[in-house]
Curated annotation (Swiss-Prot):
Gene3D superfamilies: 3.30.1320.10. GO terms for biological process: translation. GO terms for molecular function: structural constituent of ribosome. Residues 114-157 are annotated as: Disordered. Belongs to the bacterial ribosomal protein bS16 family. GO terms for cellular component: cytoplasm; small ribosomal subunit. It comes from the Bacteria. PANTHER family: 30S RIBOSOMAL PROTEIN S16, SMALL RIBOSOMAL SUBUNIT PROTEIN BS16M. This is Small ribosomal subunit protein bS16. Keywords: Ribonucleoprotein, Ribosomal protein.
Length: 157
């Protein structure tokens, strides 16, 4: 019995997901399988490729022939190089960065909220700002005048 390692398609029309399966070569694409040895999700970034290396090595060892797409996946994971005894058995599989948990994001947003805004949220109108600046300057001038008068009175006594 000729055995092939091939992809079994799952998912919707434009979002394919595949199972890496071992099946009789004569069965149809989504037909009965002997064993499911992995998954492949090409729409993720980077693509998700999870293949049970031990089972893949076993099936390759007993003569199962991988199809071309599965052969490419086995080369990426390094299982084909390990089977053939070639260098580069660690593979070239890219690993996605772990997403920050929602709890971490919430705690970070809470810490930023407690610190308060670094700049004012609203800007005052120019006319109002000029009036306040003039009033502030007048108050400073009065304070300076009072400060000058107070030492003069003390010196006179």
């Amino acid at each position: 019995m000729a055995v092939k390692i091939k992809l079994q398609r799952l998912g919707k029309i434009r979002t394919p997901h595949y199972r890496v399966v071992v099946a009789d070569a004569r069965t149809r694409r989504d037909g009965k399988v002997i064993e499911n040895i992995g998954i492949y999700e090409p729409k993720q970034d980077p693509s998700v490729i999870k293949i049970d290396s031990e089972r893949a090595q076993y099936w390759l060892g007993v003569g199962a022939q991988p199809t071309e797409p599965v052969l490419a996946l086995l080369k990426v994971t390094g299982d084909w190089q390990k089977f053939k005894g070639l260098e580069g058995a660690e593979g070239t599989l890219k690993v996605a960065e772990p997403k920050p948990s929602k709890l971490e994001l919430f705690n970070q947003a809470l810490a930023e909220a407690n610190e308060g805004p670094t700049a004012e949220a609203i800007t005052e109108k120019k006319k109002k700002a000029k009036e306040e600046a003039a009033a502030k300057a007048a108050a400073e001038a009065e304070a300076a005048a009072k400060a000058e008068e107070a030492p003069a009175e003390e010196a006179a006594e």
